Amino acid sequence: ITGEMAAAIVSSVQHEGVGTCMKHFACHNSDSRRTRVNVHVSERALREIYLAGYERVVRKAHPVSLMTAYNKINGEEVSGDNRITRDILKNEWGFDGTVVCDWGAVKDPVEASKGRIDLQMPLSKSSAAYLEQALDQLCIQAFRHSIGT
């Protein structure tokens, strides 16, 4: 029911030319200690309880954006979990909108980028430098591979 209601709201709002942002993806159960919570959940419960509503909205209403939660799921930061943001959200469900992290949620900007986090807030100078260094290393590796060394 939640997914149906949310899909109807997203569709109605976006029909008027206004983008929507679903939050807090996923397993966000509490605002207290939200940056330290590690939700332990089985794959079945994750899919049938925590992700089902989001999946319904993504497939039915195509929201413009989605915000990840602060918490961890089974030890993985949601904002850096490739399986949740890339494999399930983008690849399996076909989400083609913008994925944004909650303010300061990204601990590892490279992993977040691999997981298809499109907007990291805020992007600190140290995070930008870290990303630049990682990109430099990838370019060097690609160059070496292309020349066969």
Please tell me what each predicted stretch does.
Residues 1-149:
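Glycoside hydrolase catalytic-domain context in secreted enzymes
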